[in-house]
């Protein structure tokens, strides 16, 4: 299926616009929340459960596709693609998505594609600029410089060992 994307640059952008009457969204849109991952949040907050726009709820829409580099509680519901990694904050795939882009989703084939030309994709990659780190000192600075991405466990890189860790004995 093809979905037209409605992109939110971060949680504050989403919070400010999700229920506006002029939000260009319909039941066949996909909501995309960027910069909600380990660094973008920061801290990998549970922002992946994007709320349904009120104007769609009033129309009887109960679910829609939502994509984020964030996470959500296990008690949440709906059609969500989460933990997209690398996250947008470090230039991952969501960093290049813009409102109006078509996104192809086929769950059975495990397929998620941004339907733009290779030339446009390359142009966006070249234009992308990494945001500055949110912290310059203290724990926030250590976190920002050393946390790994979601697909790598969000651990600190300096805590990696050189040998595999065996599973604990269970009695």
Indicate where each model-derived feature is located:
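Short, small-residue-biased leader/transition segments that mark boundaries at the very start
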Residues: 1-2
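Charged helix-capping and loop-helix junction motifs
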Residues: 46-52
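Conserved structured catalytic cores and adjacent interaction surfaces
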Residues: 28-45, 58-62, 75-77, 93
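Glycine-rich phosphate/diphosphate-binding loops that line cofactor/substrate pockets in enzymes
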Residues: 17-30
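Phosphate/diphosphate-binding loops
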Residues: 55, 59-116
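Intein/HINT protein-splicing elements and their conserved insertion hotspots or analogous self-processing inserts
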Residues: 91-92, 96-171
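Phosphate-interacting basic helix/loop segments used at nucleotide- and nucleic-acid interfaces
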Residues: 10-18
């Amino acid at each position: 299926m093809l979905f037209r994307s409605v992109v939110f640059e971060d949680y504050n952008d989403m919070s400010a616009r999700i229920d506006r009457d002029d939000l260009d969204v319909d039941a066949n849109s996909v909501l995309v929340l960027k910069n909600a991952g380990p660094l973008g949040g920061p801290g990998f907050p549970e922002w992946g459960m994007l709320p349904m726009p009120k104007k769609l709820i009033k129309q009887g829409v109960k679910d829609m596709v939502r994509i984020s580099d964030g996470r959500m509680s296990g008690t949440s519901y709906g059609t969500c693609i989460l933990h997209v990694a690398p996250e947008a904050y470090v230039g991952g795939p969501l960093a290049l998505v813009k409102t109006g882009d078509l996104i192809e989703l086929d769950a059975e084939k495990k397929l998620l594609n941004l339907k733009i030309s290779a030339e446009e994709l390359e142009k966006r990659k070249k234009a992308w600029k990494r945001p500055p780190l949110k912290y310059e000192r203290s724990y926030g600075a250590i976190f920002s410089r050393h946390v790994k991405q979601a697909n790598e466990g969000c651990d600190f890189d300096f805590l990696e060992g050189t040998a595999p860790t065996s599973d604990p004995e269970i009695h």
